[in-house]
Amino acid sequence: MRIVFAGTPEFAVSSLRAAARHHEVVAVYTQPDRPAGRGRGLAPSPVKLEAVARGIPVYQPESLKDEAAQQQLRDLQPDLMVVVAYGLILPKAVLAIPTHGCWNVHASLLPRWRGAAPIQRAIQAGDTKTGVCLMQMEAGLDTGPVLLHQELPIATTDTGGQLHDKLAELGAQVLSDGLGLLRAGIKPVARPQPEQGVTYAHKLDKAEARLDWVLDAGALARTVRAFNPWPIAEASLAGERVRIHGAVALDLAHGQAPGTVLAASRDGIDIACGQGALRLRVLQREGGKAITAADYLNARRDLRVGA
């Protein structure tokens, strides 16, 4: 079976490996090299690096909307196109090119969390489970019928990065299962998504990373987890802007103004919130690296309870 794979970030690499394990991946589509690092030199995507290492031809069009790019895809004569976090819109004409259409690996239990950031939004919302769907793509945003799915519990300690890695591996397994069925001549049953329960996972914005102490401590703790490793939550701590890599919510009544330092010890720095308190465990000062609360307190001798 001739497969064209389209993906860009690290999340898609496991799925590319799964597709290449028992099938012929005739080409990989990925976004053009982008500026990265302090030198802003052009850097290849993780998917491109994996494809090159495997000797798979790589295509990097800026868009798939023009006829030349679509003809290039037709010339590959794909039986199936697998799309995993590609980042470019696939026009209807492209969806119709492969014999079996286009499959997408999506990191949520559709129709919940359609869109760009399903992993982080699930944590932020306090969901107790998520999963992966293998979807038959259509013109709408993540609206296609689901072929296979697999659930995954969300641990109360999961960060965005940790859940990302778990779902990347789960996505590869679900894709492998689907490809195995197709190879055996069995096309998975396409089940339309329910009309109820649709939510959208909008793209992350750095502005969202600024914590407002007026909010509930539980919600703030979930934001800290969801936004690690990017964009990393930040807040004002006794007059200093800090980034917060690790924190837990405390269910306690305090009667203090939001943002007040309630306690400070090696275990963490407790900050009054609109409801409860947030214990900061891992912080980062401007221009510095992530450090424990104990190390932060050693560096900030001026920090006082009640500030």
From Swiss-Prot:
Top-level taxonomy: Bacteria, Pseudomonadati, Pseudomonadota, Gammaproteobacteria, Lysobacterales
GO terms of molecular function: methionyl-tRNA formyltransferase activity
Name of the gene encoding the protein in the UniProt record: fmt
Gene3D superfamilies tied to this protein: Formyl transferase, C-terminal domain, Formyl transferase, N-terminal domain
UniProt binding sites for (6S)-5,6,7,8-tetrahydrofolate: S108, L109, L110, P111
Role summary: Attaches a formyl group to the free amino group of methionyl-tRNA(fMet). The formyl group appears to play a dual role in the initiator identity of N-formylmethionyl-tRNA by promoting its recognition by IF2 and preventing the misappropriation of this tRNA by the elongation apparatus.
EC assignment: 2.1.2.9
Keyword Transmembrane helix: no
Protein name as catalogued: Methionyl-tRNA formyltransferase
Catalytic activity: L-methionyl-tRNA(fMet) + (6R)-10-formyltetrahydrofolate = N-formyl-L-methionyl-tRNA(fMet) + (6S)-5,6,7,8-tetrahydrofolate + H(+)
Keyword flag Transferase: yes
Organism listed in the record: Stenotrophomonas maltophilia (strain R551-3)
UniProt family annotation: Belongs to the Fmt family.
Annotated GO CC locations: cytosol
CDD domains: FMT_core_Met-tRNA-FMT_N (cd08646), Met_tRNA_FMT_C (cd08704)
UniProtKB keywords: Protein biosynthesis, Transferase
Class of this enzyme: transferase
PROSITE patterns assigned to the protein according to its UniProt record, in alphabetical order: GART (PS00373)
